[in-house]
């Protein structure tokens, strides 16, 4: 596998590891702290800028329940210093299971890929 793709997938895995472990510091480390960051949690309105996104993650990670992610259907595309990962987040929690279709956009800063946009949409059964 291309080492750049491996780096992007490692950054993406770090995002989900931070979520699963409910580690706000780890979540902070995977995001770019800028005005251009955007996040859409399933069922939430669009959140813009790092301070607002950080507060949303604090609320989620300190809230009740735990999520385990089984990531499937991953695809990576890279164009210069921008990369995006599309995937299915298969969630397992105390309430059952569900799938969220997600897109994560990363920007390379030096040799680090930082998350600049996350969008998750629930998959409705047909």
PLM segments and residue spans:
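A beta-strand edge to alpha-helix "cap/lid" segment located at domain peripheries
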Residues: 1-32, 36-126
